[in-house]
Amino acid sequence: MDPDAVAKAFVEHYYSTFDANRPGLVSLYQEGSMLTFEGQKIQGSQNIVAKLTGLPFQQCKHNITTVDCQPSGPAGGMLVFVSGNLQLAGEQHALKFSQMFHLISNQGNYYVFNDIFRLNYA
């Protein structure tokens, strides 16, 4: 499958799940996965989802601006870099964000091995 198509499909699935059913993200991570969220490192699928479901907002909408990807390693991994806007319910202004995913191929499916998220305040 075309890497750009895989990246686009992953990004659409990830953010639609985040916006509508954050606990559902658990299947995208494994116990060896790591999230760096605003500088805080969290390891393991359960811990990552606990962090994401514990954020101080319940409703949000991600609007994706760009998706870039590159193949990573001989085993079919992929780097995916995303930028966009995060609109929180009840807030007038959206927050700009960047997020990088390192996806690892596992029997025809992908899981998130590394995930780095930052809000962009500039």
Curated annotation (Swiss-Prot):
It is found in: Cytoplasm; Nucleus; Nucleus envelope. One of its GO terms (cellular component) is nucleus. Residues 6-119 form the NTF2 domain. InterPro entries: NTF2, NTF2-like_dom_sf, NTF2_dom, Nuclear_transport_factor_2_euk. The keyword Signal does not apply. The gene is NTF2A. GO terms for biological process: protein import into nucleus. This is Nuclear transport factor 2A. It comes from Arabidopsis thaliana. GO terms for molecular function: small GTPase binding. The modification N-acetylmethionine is found at residue 1.
